């Protein structure tokens, strides 16, 4: 497939795109929202030959898309609750991401359930049956065992090798299964957005949308305060938990999911995600997951979040206590608030069907997505899961094509490599040999281009001692990934900002690259 456009996003391209839109005619599609669903729609539209612009009032991955567990789920939880369709789709989409779209960003994550005395025979049998069902889903989805190994039981000696702080009294081995894990969710959003730009989409951050109808939007550059009207044959609302601001007829029920951040040393540097059944629940777990930058993310919760929707949700003290109490049931040495070095919370844009009633738990609300058309003709997509973003984008775009009689090719994203995948290395393909492993892990085949494009001094040195992010990555965030301010670099292009003390150490370095 031809890719005549650059994948680079930066201030100059943003300015040129805004000028072109203000001076030009109508587009085929306008997408509102720069999370994973929105960028997925922009990529799908661009690769079908449609003219498309995406506008985001903040930065890419500003909302829910950066607050996930960083997992590409195979749908096991949905199978356990009877949602066979979602489970199968999740397994299929996981396989597409791991083998075709983004093998450089998604890898197999071992999930360890330690068999402790507190876990009775019935619960053990249910977990084992669930893991076997997960194996069957993997086979059904066509994902090879070389990509996601089969589940199995392991002895206690192996359990303590891969999760050294697990409780050893009465440990009877463990159950080990595998799921997909992203190097980072915001990095996936960035890869999809830049691949969309590579195919001609205009990706515009810090641009607000108002007076939205099915064929027009008033856009305001939030940096210059200049506004202009833009027309399109289809306007798609992919604003996530903020979708109701675009179409007030939508009924959403936001659910908050909280994670705590630890230094991996607090868990003795595990190599598997410690997976702890939540007491009293059949198919819910708390995960302590090894992550990039030497961190552990512990999550997650599922709590009703009524009321005004904040830009940056905050964890509650009750959620923090719940996560610590749950994980400590499986640890020989307890972790506490003194060990927590950061925390984050995100809001799931669940559809409020009214069926569960006011007292129903958000954990029981469907994770399926839905497409709606407002009285003014705005097409909205709400609900869904990160794993299914590609399928959701295909679904809503098919609906838009039908409703608006757009002339478009068939969907091409199932087999489309994102920027950084081996088949899409960028303009300076080369080996990652000699480059920091963490750089290659975050950029894949594009890592050589990150280093080659750097004009700064000491490009492969870390931005600060003990922080495994290179100076070249800060520069690339500005020159190729559309970062316009310090928060863009620290909170979304890299995830240094999840740990406040690390953030403080590199703010000056980020400002240095923004001022160049």
UniProtKB/Swiss-Prot annotation:
What SUPFAM superfamilies does the annotation carry? FAD/NAD(P)-binding domain
What is this enzyme's EC?
A: 1.1.5.3
Q: Name one GO molecular function term.
A: glycerol-3-phosphate dehydrogenase (quinone) activity
Q: Which UniProt keywords apply?
A: Cytoplasm, FAD, Flavoprotein, Glycerol metabolism, Oxidoreductase
InterPro entries referenced in this protein's UniProt entry, alphabetically: DAO_C (IPR031656), DAO_C_sf (IPR038299), FAD-dep_OxRdtase (IPR006076), FAD/NAD-bd_sf (IPR036188), G3P_DH_FAD-dep (IPR000447)
Superkingdom assignment: Bacteria
Q: Respond yes or no to whether keyword Flavoprotein is given for this record.
A: yes
What reaction gets catalysed by this protein? a quinone + sn-glycerol 3-phosphate = dihydroxyacetone phosphate + a quinol
Tell me, what's a Pfam family for it?
A: DAO
Where is it mainly found?
cytoplasm
Annotated residues for binding of FAD:
28-56
Q: Which GO terms describe its biological process?
A: glycerol metabolic process; glycerol-3-phosphate catabolic process
Cofactor(s), by name: FAD
Q: Where is it located?
A: Cytoplasm
Q: Which GO terms describe its cellular component?
A: cytoplasm; peptidoglycan-based cell wall; plasma membrane
- PROSITE patterns in alphabetical order: FAD_G3PDH_1, FAD_G3PDH_2
- Enzyme class, top EC level, equals oxidoreductase
Q: Which family does it belong to?
A: Belongs to the FAD-dependent glycerol-3-phosphate dehydrogenase family.
Q: What is this protein called?
A: Glycerol-3-phosphate dehydrogenase 1
Q: Which gene encodes it?
A: glpD1
